[in-house]
Amino acid sequence: MNITAIRNEQNPQPLIQLKNINVVFAQKTALQDINLNIYPNSIITIVGPNGGGKSTLLKTLLKLQMPTSGEVIYSKNVRIGYVPQKIHLDHSLPITVERFLSLKKGIKTQEISTALEQLSISHLRKSNMQKLSGGEMQRVLLTRAILNKPNLLVLDEPTQGVDITGQAELYQLIHQTQQKLNCAVLMVSHDLHIVMADSKEVLCINQHICCAGTPDVLSNDPTFMRLWGNQIAQNVGFYTHHHNHHHTLHGDVCGCNSSAVHCQNKDK
């Protein structure tokens, strides 16, 4: 399946092109025939089962994993800001937020101040990284990612372990950041159905691209509005899968079926 993100009419050239990407580990296929164009200002969410290749796709895009075959083409002006799923900090070596952000090469103190203010966490400047809450840590990692003023923001499962209220707040923050930077967003979601409402394209990946589409806007659902309120409904969307095939527990395609819509998580 070939997927092309929403094309920006004023910037027709993609920031990144993935062409026929295949990744194989010890005869086990991680990615198969992935084709994807990422255009300026687009917002793409990638979902799929555990072990389905989502993280491998990000690593390939970030040049952390060489594809077995295929190629990744980068535009000359692409600047990527990356928000990892988590970082490991040595608790025996305390480090403040300010010091952590200053470790990024070529960053000035004023740039750190501006980024902290933009993410509304200036009050955390002197805080110990090891003592931050999960939500605070995500904001710090997002702050670090925008220091180089990226035109593509890549986030690996930013809402993992966060309840739906926290997800809505984080999605709103990502939306605001995207608007200020005028950048594209590529995000991996751990949830198969709940995604950022602003996603222009949702891709379900299980080795290959199983299906793609747009999320349903939950603010149009009066029942959801009554249960969760306007803020959550405005920022959270629901993605309905429409697969035409099934996968075995090992991820292999086991036949086509026009009614196949199931996507199950499996152990990594």
Swiss-Prot record:
It holds the Pfam family ABC_tran. One of its GO terms (cellular component) is plasma membrane. It catalyses: Zn(2+)(out) + ATP(in) + H2O(in) = Zn(2+)(in) + ADP(in) + phosphate(in) + H(+)(in). GO terms for biological process: response to zinc ion. GO terms for molecular function: ABC-type zinc transporter activity; ATP binding; ATP hydrolysis activity. It is a peripheral membrane protein. Keywords: ATP-binding, Cell inner membrane, Cell membrane, Ion transport, Membrane, Nucleotide-binding, Translocase, Transport, Zinc, Zinc transport. InterPro entries: AAA+_ATPase (IPR003593), ABC_transporter-like_ATP-bd (IPR003439), Metal_Ion_Import_ABC (IPR050153), P-loop_NTPase (IPR027417). The keyword Cell membrane applies. Its main location: membrane. SUPFAM superfamilies: P-loop containing nucleoside triphosphate hydrolases. It is found in: Cell inner membrane. ATP binds at G48, P49, N50, G51, G52, G53, K54, S55. Its EC number is 7.2.2.20. Residues 16-231 form the ABC transporter domain. The complex is composed of two ATP-binding proteins (ZnuC), two transmembrane proteins (ZnuB) and a solute-binding protein (ZnuA). Part of the ABC transporter complex ZnuABC involved in zinc import. Responsible for energy coupling to the transport system. Belongs to the ABC transporter superfamily. Zinc importer (TC 3.A.1.15.5) family. This is Zinc import ATP-binding protein ZnuC. The gene is znuC.
